[in-house]
């Protein structure tokens, strides 16, 4: 869409942060109003992350107004909230392309803008990176300031606290802003607290505090008295004891929607030495009532009509794989009170809403804490329960040592329900489920299953749940199932594939939900088609049978080729000295960018047309 200057006259004056800093302060509330309306107008037309950005408009304006970005370095955690940042940093007219193939990246991205200091997508990385950036800035001696913005969800992760603990030790000059949008601003976060925050961040208070510490540093009783007095005074009005104990100077909480108040506080804090912590309270979805009332639903939105206040409803077609998992989870829990389900803050995305309501005492949302989720599951298994960890492929990467050390070595029966495996679409490089087969396949005695449809997915979940000799994993994609009939649950024979079609010279060994595309290719080329089902243990007998009865083999998977299921087939053939040609089809050796799943599969040659073209070129 073209930018309407008449509709957004103040925003039209801001093509860069340099122009933003030329505006009089009195015009900034109007700028915030226009920025919020422009965000609503843009995202409702194009889709994207929505409610978080509405809540950070004033903070974004204030930070870029006070700090000399991009010289001063502003780091956004995760990046859902960074749409206003993109709009103010030269990308205003392209915001309608966000999350689309070839468009703006969904998160801050170093290759896109000098204002994007850190490429992000996963949570809780900002403070660690910020410490490194602040230390580097100090060593180069250019008085470059560092600011990290982190949300109340991301700060729950252990990595954030590890970083703050380190910052308290080495004391770099940096500011951490906690964007706390868990609740609306209450009365005690009003004028009095804002005044106190400005006072506590001001030069008089800082000078008295630091001066007093220096003067009485050699007099232990007085020094301790000063410290206790300061703690008592601040403790009466400031809920920041934890952050103070970690070594930060805590200011807040303050109203995150008072742009002028934020500017005053940020200016006061800008030149303070050591690690500073500013706690702001915001409303997720601010300025758009439907998003304020239901920020979870409006977190990420498709195209919608903002005047209706409603998101378009599902067409009522086939269920998603997440829904298939959620239904199986409820069905199994109703029969077995030993079932325990765990998610690291992905209840809705993983299809666990119904389970959480029906079985609240067996549902555990551990927040953004993937490492803890896995070891917590290990403890439940040791205690005689049957834990299921529902987790996205890309987030399981964050708990790899726990899978190895805490689950697999001890042969604990933990089932990993791995959602969003393969190409996920619009969230791009940071969220593609490209590597789980590669990083799990090397774990001794782990069972790994790849269903080709929703019925097989249910059977594999059932099989993994009843597998007691160690961990198991079922990986399934983002998106809808294919519409096959659901049959009664039964355990599959471990490590056994099935032949779906008999052909002649070529055999296609398929792993996972690319099966419908592989079936089209098999029909076109008169090839044998095998549903391998298990990546580990592989059906070696079936692989050797296919090698003996065909001139060439093709493996198909939606995982990185390197180290994936196809690599496993190659290893089997080499171990048995079978010199049959093998073509491995899967994800190439680069990070897959954003685009719809259909667009990216077509581009990477993972649809039927692309697979057939690759096979014909290879056979030529």
Curated annotation (Swiss-Prot):
Alphabetical list of Pfam families matching this protein: DXP_synthase_N, Transket_pyr, Transketolase_C
InterPro entries: Dxylulose-5-P_synthase, THDP-binding, Transketo_C/PFOR_II, Transketolase-like_Pyr-bd, Transketolase_BS, Transketolase_C, Transketolase_CS
Cofactor: Mg(2+); thiamine diphosphate
Keyword Metal-binding carried by entry: yes
Domain of life: Bacteria
Binding site for thiamine diphosphate: 80, 121-123, 153-154, 181, 288, 370
One Gene Ontology cellular component annotation held by this UniProt entry: cytosol
Keywords for the protein's UniProt record, in alphabetical order: Isoprene biosynthesis, Magnesium, Metal-binding, Thiamine biosynthesis, Thiamine pyrophosphate, Transferase
Enzyme class, broadest EC rank: transferase
UniProt pathway annotation: Metabolic intermediate biosynthesis; 1-deoxy-D-xylulose 5-phosphate biosynthesis; 1-deoxy-D-xylulose 5-phosphate from D-glyceraldehyde 3-phosphate and pyruvate: step 1/1
SUPFAM superfamilies in alphabetical order: Thiamin diphosphate-binding fold (THDP-binding), TK C-terminal domain-like
Biological processes, Gene Ontology terms: 1-deoxy-D-xylulose 5-phosphate biosynthetic process; isopentenyl diphosphate biosynthetic process, methylerythritol 4-phosphate pathway; terpenoid biosynthetic process; thiamine biosynthetic process
Residue positions binding Mg(2+): 152, 181
E.C. code: 2.2.1.7
Gene Ontology molecular function: any one: 1-deoxy-D-xylulose-5-phosphate synthase activity
Cofactor binding description: Binds 1 Mg(2+) ion per subunit. Binds 1 thiamine pyrophosphate per subunit.
Gene3D superfamilies noted in UniProt: 3.40.50.920, 3.40.50.970
NCBIfam families: dxs, PRK05444.2-2
Family per record: Belongs to the transketolase family. DXPS subfamily.
Self-association state and partner proteins as the record states: Homodimer.
PANTHER family: 1-D-DEOXYXYLULOSE 5-PHOSPHATE SYNTHASE-RELATED, 1-DEOXY-D-XYLULOSE-5-PHOSPHATE SYNTHASE, CHLOROPLASTIC
Function comment: Catalyzes the acyloin condensation reaction between C atoms 2 and 3 of pyruvate and glyceraldehyde 3-phosphate to yield 1-deoxy-D-xylulose-5-phosphate (DXP).
Designated name of the protein: 1-deoxy-D-xylulose-5-phosphate synthase
Record organism: Escherichia coli O6:H1 (strain CFT073 / ATCC 700928 / UPEC)
Gene that encodes it: dxs
């Amino acid at each position: 869409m073209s930018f309407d200057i008449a509709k957004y006259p103040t925003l039209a004056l801001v093509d860069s942060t340099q122009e933003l800093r030329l505006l009089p302060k009195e015009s900034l509330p109007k700028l915030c109003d226009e920025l919020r309306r422009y965000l609503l107008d843009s995202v409702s037309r194009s889709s994207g992350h929505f409610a978080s950005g509405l809540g950070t408009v004033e903070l974004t304006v204030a930070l870029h107004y006070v700090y000399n970005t991009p010289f001063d370095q502003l780091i956004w955690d995760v990046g859902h909230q960074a749409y206003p940042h993109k709009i103010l940093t030269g990308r205003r007219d392209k915001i309608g392309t966000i999350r689309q193939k070839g468009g703006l990246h969904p998160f801050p991205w170093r290759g896109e803008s000098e204002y994007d200091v850190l490429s992000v997508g996963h949570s809780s990385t900002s403070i660690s990176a910020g410490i490194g950036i602040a230390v580097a800035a100090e060593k180069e001696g250019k008085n470059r300031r560092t600011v990290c913005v982190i949300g109340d969800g991301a700060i729950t992760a252990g990595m954030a606290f590890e970083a703050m603990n380190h910052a308290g030790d080495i004391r770099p000059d940096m500011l951490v802003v906690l964007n706390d949008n868990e609740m609306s601003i209450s009365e005690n976060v009003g004028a009095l607290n804002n005044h106190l925050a400005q006072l506590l961040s001001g030069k008089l208070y800082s000078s008295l505090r630091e001066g007093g510490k220096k003067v009485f540093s050699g007099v232990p009783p007085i020094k301790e008295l000063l410290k206790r007095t300061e703690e008592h005074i601040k403790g009466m009005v400031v809920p920041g004891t934890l952050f103070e104990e970690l070594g930060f100077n805590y200011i807040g909480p303050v109203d995150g929607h008072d742009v002028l108040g934020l500017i005053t506080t940020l200016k006061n804090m800008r030149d303070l030495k050591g690690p500073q912590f500013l706690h702001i309270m915001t409303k997720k979805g601010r300025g758009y009532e439907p998003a304020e009332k239901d920020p979870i639903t409006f977190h990420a939105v498709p195209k919608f009509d903002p005047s209706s206040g409603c998101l378009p409803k599902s067409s009522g077609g086939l269920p998603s794989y997440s829904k298939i998992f959620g239904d199986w989870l409820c069905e199994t829990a109703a029969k077995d009170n030993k079932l325990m389900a765990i998610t690291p803050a992905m209840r809705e995305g993983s299809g666990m809403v119904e389970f959480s309501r029906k079985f609240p005492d067996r549902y555990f949302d551990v927040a953004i804490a993937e490492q803890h989720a896995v070891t917590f599951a290990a403890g439940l298994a040791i205690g005689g329960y049957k834990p299921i960890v529902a987790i996205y492929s890309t987030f399981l990467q964050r708990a790899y040592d726990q899978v190895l050390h805490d689950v697999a070595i001890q042969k604990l029966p933990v089932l990993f329900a791995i959602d969003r495996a393969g190409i996920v679409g619009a969230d791009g490089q940071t969220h593609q489920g490209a590597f789980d087969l590669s990083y799990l396949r090397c774990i001794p005695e782990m069972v790994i299953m790849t269903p080709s449809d929703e019925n097989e997915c249910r059977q594999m979940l059932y099989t993994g749940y009843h597998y007691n000799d160690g961990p198991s994993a079922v990986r399934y994609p983002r998106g809808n199932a294919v519409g096959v009939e659901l049959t009664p649950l039964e355990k599959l024979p471990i490590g056994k594939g099935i032949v779906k079609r008999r052909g002649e010279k070529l055999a296609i060994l398929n792993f996972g939900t690319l099966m419908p595309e592989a079936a089209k290719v098999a029909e076109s080329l008169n090839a044998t088609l095998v549903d391998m089902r298990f990546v580990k243990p592989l059906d070696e007998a079936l692989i050797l049978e296919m090698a003996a009865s065909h001139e060439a083999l093709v493996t198909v998977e939606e995982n990185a080729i390197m180290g994936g299921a196809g690599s496993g087939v190659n290893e089997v053939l080499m171990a048995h000295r079978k010199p049959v040609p093998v073509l491995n089809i899967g994800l190439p050796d680069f990070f897959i960018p954003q685009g719809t799943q259909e667009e990216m599969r077509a581009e990477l040659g993972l649809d039927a047309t692309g697979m057939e073209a690759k096979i014909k070129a290879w056979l030529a």
